[in-house]
Amino acid sequence: TRYWIVRPGDSPAHVVPAVRTLLEVLGTRFQERLAEMGLPPYRLEITSALRTAERQARLRRNNANAAAGVSSHEFGTTVDLSYAAFAPPAEVPGQIIDGVSEDLRPHIRRIADLAFESVSARKSRELGRIFSQVLAEAQDEGIALVIYERQQTVYHLTVGRAM
């Protein structure tokens, strides 16, 4: 989407509608903050969403953060969002592509994506700091419960009752 991507893995990207709404709110706020700082509209990376009980049990063997017993991931109310990696913008900004002939646009898009990924990698701490501020505000508003996971470089995000 405009605000996030789902990193390929063995976790289906299914969530309850309130999580999708929450992701839209967080993505909008994140990109607004980036725009205020003159940065491109980077997107959030979802690393995990819906999990079966079996998948959760397997994960628990290697991940100390994985809940024992029932996990909120089993209900589609939770996603894990990377705080160390951010995806390039969904669209190449107009100022990069305007005036470029149609036959060159695919090449320019590919080069722009590579450049955005390179900048994202170098600026991941700054982007992560901005995103953490957005999450803290969402938690203060009661629309999200956020858990910082050190070993997996993700925020464990559960939709809040206020959503």
Stretch-by-stretch model annotation:
Residues 28, 57-61, 129, 133-137:
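Charged/polar, solvent-exposed surface patches and flexible loops
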Residues 15-20, 50-56, 118-119, 126-132:
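N-terminal start-of-chain detector that recognizes signal peptides
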Residues 8-14, 43-49, 110-111, 119-125:
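Generic detector of short, locally flexible boundary/turn motifs and exposed helical patches
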Residues 66-163:
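Catalytic cores and adjacent binding grooves of peptidoglycan-active enzymes
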Residues 1-40:
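Active-site acidic/histidine clusters and adjacent loop/turn architecture
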Residues 53-69:
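Charged, often glycine-rich, active-site loop that binds/positions anionic groups
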Residues 39-57:
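Acidic helix-start/capping segments at beta-turn-to-alpha-helix junctions
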